[in-house]
């Protein structure tokens, strides 16, 4: 999980979602997981 000021999809499987008011990227590749913070 990477915590970044700006989250962007890295590949075509990355999905940008909102959980509990936080913007997150979920993906099949665990290296692509990101959270805005």
Swiss-Prot record:
GO molecular function per UniProt: structural constituent of ribosome
Superkingdom in the source lineage: Bacteria
Keyword DNA repair: no
InterPro entries for the chain: Ribosomal_bL36, Ribosomal_bL36_sp
Keywords for the protein's UniProt record, in alphabetical order: Ribonucleoprotein, Ribosomal protein
Signal found in the keyword field: no
Stored Pfam families: Ribosomal_L36 (PF00444)
GO process terms (BP): translation
GO cellular component: cytoplasm; ribonucleoprotein complex; ribosome
Entry-linked PANTHER family: 50S RIBOSOMAL PROTEIN L36, CHLOROPLASTIC, LARGE RIBOSOMAL SUBUNIT PROTEIN BL36C
NCBIfam families the record matches: rpmJ_bact (TIGR01022)
Family (UniProt): Belongs to the bacterial ribosomal protein bL36 family.
Protein name, entry field: Large ribosomal subunit protein bL36
């Amino acid at each position: 999980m990477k915590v970044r000021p700006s989250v962007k999809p890295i590949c075509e499987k990355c999905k940008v979602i909102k959980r509990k008011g936080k913007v997150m990227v979920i993906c099949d590749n665990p290296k692509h997981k990101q959270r805005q913070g």
